[in-house]
Every structure is written in C-alpha cells, then in structure tokens.
Amino acid sequence: MSYTPMSDLGQQGLFDITRTLLQQPDLASLCEALSQLVKRSALADNAAIVLWQAQTQRASYYASREKDTPIKYEDETVLAHGPVRSILSRPDTLHCSYEEFCETWPQLDAGGLYPKFGHYCLMPLAAEGHIFGGCEFIRYDDRPWSEKEFNRLQTFTQIVSVVTEQIQSRVVNNVDYELLCRERDNFRILVAITNAVLSRLDMDELVSEVAKEIHYYFDIDDISIVLRSHRKNKLNIYSTHYLDKQHPAHEQSEVDEAGTLTERVFKSKEMLLINLHERDDLAPYERMLFDTWGNQIQTLCLLPLMSGDTMLGVLKLAQCEEKVFTTTNLNLLRQIAERVAIAVDNALAYQEIHRLKERLVDENLALTEQLNNVDSEFGEIIGRSEAMYSVLKQVEMVAQSDSTVLILGETGTGKELIARAIHNLSGRNNRRMVKMNCAAMPAGLLESDLFGHERGAFTGASAQRIGRFELADKSSLFLDEVGDMPLELQPKLLRVLQEQEFERLGSNKIIQTDVRLIAATNRDLKKMVADREFRSDLYYRLNVFPIHLPPLRERPEDIPLLAKAFTFKIARRLGRNIDSIPAETLRTLSNMEWPGNVRELENVIERAVLLTRGNVLQLSLPDIVLPEPETPPAATVVALEGEDEYQLIVRVLKETNGVVAGPKGAAQRLGLKRTTLLSRMKRLGIDKSALI
C-alpha cells in the first residue's frame, strides 16, 4: 500500500496543524508557527519560507530564530541566486549537508544568514502546478531525515503552500481595498469641494469656502488665492489664516509681484513645493508667514490655477508640518486646484459682467436675474418640510426637460416662485421667463396679449404688437390662473402646445415658436372639465407633469422660517431695525390655519413691522380675523321629471325675472355661486334678457 503523506498525521492531527497555520495573519507569523510545529514534532530545529518574485527575479525570505525577532528580507538578489532557484528548474526536494550548502552557495554562508547546521532541506511551494517558492527545514545535529519524516515535512509544505497563497491573496486584496477606499474618499472630497466652490461668484466668499474645505480635509492652516491685479506688476491676495480654528481671519491685500515665489509659478506654470526658512531671501508678504506662525519653518505649496492655457492665479498653501504634503495629498490637491480654477474663472467672469452691466442693461437683463439667484437653485423659495422637499425634488426632475408643467395649489402658495425655479434650472435660463396672469386680463385683450396682433386688427390696434408667445421663444412662458382662460380661447392655446405655431390677430401668417409652457391655477380643473367649463383636451395637454403645492397649514414647520425671512426682508426695505421675533409669536403663527397661505402670512408680517417700535417684532394676534370659507347656498328648487339642466335654468330665470344674484336670485335658488351660474348660462347659450 502506497504511503499518503497526510494519513500518517491522523485526521485530528492534520486538522489541528491546518487550523493553526490558517490562523496566521501574515507570512512572518506563519513562519513562526511553522517553526514551533516542526520543533514539537522533532522534525526540524527551524523553518523558513522563501518566495520567488518572478517579475523582479528576486526572492523574499521569512524565518524565525530562537530568542530573536523574526527575520524578514524582501526583494533580495543574493537569496534569489540561492537554493530557491534550483527548485524552480527541478521541482524536487533539495537535501544537503552544511558543507555541501556552503560549497554550492558560498555567498549565503558569507552573509551570515544561515548559522552552522547539520542538515538542510528545501521543498517546493506550489499552487496549480506553478512553483512560487520553497519551504526550508534545518536540523542543527547530524541526524538525517527518515523517509517517514520527509513525508511529514512534505505534508507541512503542502499546507504552507495553501496558507501562503491565501495570505498573499489577502495582502493583494487589502491593498486593492485600501486603494479603492482612498479613491472613494478622494472622490468624495473632490465632489464636496466642487459643490462648495462652483456656486461662489464673489471672490471673498470663494476664497473663504475654498479655505474652509481644504482646512477641513487636510488640516492646512494658511490658504490663499493669488491673482494678478489690473494694476501692472501687482498681485491681489485673498488669504484665510486658521490661527483660531473657530474664528479664521480673512484678509485681502495688494503686493508687488517682483521677486515673489508666486512670480516663479506664474512663469513656469508648474507646482512649487518648498521649505521656507527665516533666513531665506523672501518677498515681504511671504516673510509675514513667520510673523503669523511664530517663526516656525514653513512648507509652502503653490499650485497653478489654469483655464486651458491661461494662467488665472495661484493656490498657495502654507503649513508648519511638511508631512501634510505627501505624494497622495499632492495629487489630490492638484485635482482640487483644477476645480478651484473653474470657480475662479467663473468668479472673474462674474466680476466682468458686473462691471459691464451699466452699458448692457437691455442685453444683460436676463443674465442679471440669473446671477442674482445663482447662490440658490430655488431662488426665494423657503422651506425645509417634507412637503416642500417633495415639491423641490419634482422641480429638479422636470426642469431639464421641455415638458409642460401644471402647478396646482391654493392662492398664495407661491406658484410663481416654483415656475421661476423650474425655468432657472432649465436649459432655457439664459433668457428671461415671460409671465402672464390670465385672470388679470380682460377676455377681449387676453388673445391679443398672448398671440399679438397686427396693426388695424381691431379698433384701437394702431400698431403691431408682439405677443407673449413670441417674447417667450427659446424661453419659458408662465401662464398663471390658467383655469380662468375663456373657453373660446382654449383651442388656440391647445394648438400652440401641439404644433408650436400660431397666428397673430389680423394675420394669416403662421409663426413658429419654441416655448416651454408652465401653467398654474388654484382651481379644480378636473371638476371644471366635468362641468364643461374647461376643455378636456387642453387639460390633458397641460397635465403632463402636475406639481401640487401644499397649503401653508400642511407645512407648519416652515412658518417660523418664512416669518423670520419676511420680517428681516420687510424691515430692511422699510428701514426698520428688527432683529428678533418672540418664540411665543412663532408658535402661535405656526398653529394658525392661514387660508391665504404664504401671501397672507407676508401681509400680516408687513403690518406687524409697520406697527413695531423697537427691535423685537410686535404682532397683535387678536387683530387677525380669519374669514370663514365660502360655501355655496343650498338649492331650494329641483328639476322636474324629464327636465334637463337647460330647461331648469330657463325656468328658474323666468321665475326670478332674470335676476341672477342676491338672496332671491336664480343662483341662490339653484344652490350655485353666481359665477358658476353665469358660466353655465354662457355654455348653454342662455340669454336672460330674452326670457324677460
């Protein structure tokens, strides 16, 4: 019966050995455990692991010496020309005496790595038929190994092969994992800094934000952005110093460019990393670093801010500890400098636009509105409630498309602000949004205002007029109170939405337009469609992406924010110095119903600001009277058998002698609002004057 190496140890013995070796975290520990096992088994006095590095043609050596620290050599050339090279070409067990060992590999004997021994054995470590090293066993006495002992050593070697491969794989995986984690963290830092700086158009704010982020992530205490001044040979320096971590100091100054380290970077367009000493020949403003930080040695990193081939400025970072500027951190700081360069470019462009706005009033109107709102994607919208968060998420989702949006909500909920936010976030925000209130325009003029008219199209049309749809070409048109649009005008609006074309009044020329429509109403369009007061086809065309604005009573947590914002805005406008609102007032405001929503709240706050004496808002809450909601009257007549709506209205009008409103009017008897009855009469073609 042939001998199986592992059977000699027994199942439990093999399990114990395997478990012991598998528990080792690294190769040094593995070698230590292996040495102890072979000593206890009286198989050898010492053991070592030699790994072959095929790419570099070198070897790594791990050994354990009694009463000594573990021995570890990596990337060794001398070891690579030792016994391990022999088993690579002839994968058999290598066995020799000390004299034979020294004669074959004298360089190893001269190196003192191997103390005098009796017998030496090297068995190949292999995985999937590939030899990647060897396992050394040494006896210090003259006893040779028996065949049985060789077999046991072979068993140990097989286990060590598996464990070594696992440890190496784990090391590679850990390195890869650490690399991925570092890349992930670096990406998060880049995203955070990009988001923080790209919206800053004021240079002071930009530098402050850049400094805050770099200090937070890198613990760098002195951050500056250096730009060339419009004055020749001068530099504008925007600096932030974190002498006090909680209260950083911000400075702006102008200095001479000549002889500065910044000048060197402007010329070379390359990063400069340098250790500064107080005895160095430095420009005055650079020497101030030692005054600021107590004469400590400064490490200075200057990164060019490039926009294409144009040098915009320099990001200057100073730190007392050189270890901050590691290779990894420098690579990340270079990428941060690229983002900062974009932000600086934007800020400089903004400054140029601001300088030219007096000369370009008409052309810059839309751009000025956009820049005024650039610090907030949602302009003047105030709210942190879940209801408003849901609305703003919908705004973000639909803004970049050209889909029609229908904004639904009670009066005073801020439908126009939502429409403006959609426009500002869209690709059409380089042009001004055109607005129109359908309820504020007489029906006879609404068509002319929307579509324009030619000269002489009707009495009083003395000149051609461009309508809102033409003005809104390549932009957005906001139709407020679209539910009040007359029925006879609705088909023409539908045609524009479907065909993107229309005709001016008094003209048969078709005008093409590219308009994104945003409509709003506080009315129930579904009910109006059911009552035949609104066209169903237009409703479905408008209702592509409805956004429901919550009334103020459904987001009471936003009321304190709104109250504070209105108070400070109105006080500033009226020249009042009001800087606080009593907590009890805010609680009371939050518990009110606000049928007029945000608009009503703003009006109440404005009245309170006018009446306040002092710097604390004084609000007389008993003066606020909430109107009862209007309810339709109860009907006092019913339709007779076989009588339709037309016949019923005609009969009641005859009974009231054509009187529609009032306590004895037809609307009261039918249980309808006056406006509802008039709308139905118009739809049914009923002329009350013909009935009297």
Curated annotation (Swiss-Prot):
Domain Sigma-54 factor interaction: 381-610
GO cellular component: a single term: transcription regulator complex
GO biological process: DNA-templated transcription; phosphorelay signal transduction system; positive regulation of DNA-templated transcription; positive regulation of DNA-templated transcription initiation
Top-level taxon: Bacteria
Summary of the knockout phenotype: Loss of formate-inducible expression of the hyf operon.
SUPFAM superfamilies: GAF domain-like, Homeodomain-like, P-loop containing nucleoside triphosphate hydrolases
Positions annotated to bind ATP: 409-416, 472-481
Molecular-function annotations in GO: ATP binding; ATP hydrolysis activity; cis-regulatory region sequence-specific DNA binding; DNA-binding transcription activator activity; identical protein binding
UniProt KW keywords: Activator, ATP-binding, DNA-binding, Nucleotide-binding, Transcription, Transcription regulation, Two-component regulatory system
The keyword Transcription is annotated on this UniProt entry: yes
Gene3D superfamilies according to UniProt: 1.10.8.60, 3.30.450.40, Homeodomain-like, P-loop containing nucleotide triphosphate hydrolases
CDD domains assigned to the protein according to its UniProt record, in alphabetical order: AAA
Residues in the DNA-binding region annotation: 663-682
Residue stretches making up the GAF domain: 202-344
InterPro entries hit by this protein: AAA+_ATPase, GAF, GAF-like_dom_sf, Homeodomain-like_sf, HTH_Fis, P-loop_NTPase, Sigma_54_int, Sigma_54_int_dom_ATP-bd_1
PANTHER family: DNA-BINDING TRANSCRIPTIONAL ACTIVATOR HYFR-RELATED, TRANSCRIPTIONAL REGULATORY PROTEIN
Described purpose of this protein according to its UniProt entry: Required for induction of expression of the formate dehydrogenase H and hydrogenase-3 structural genes. Also activates expression of hyf operon (encodes the silent hydrogenase-4 gene cluster).
Protein name stated in the entry: Formate hydrogenlyase transcriptional activator FhlA
Species, as recorded: Escherichia coli (strain K12)
Gene: fhlA
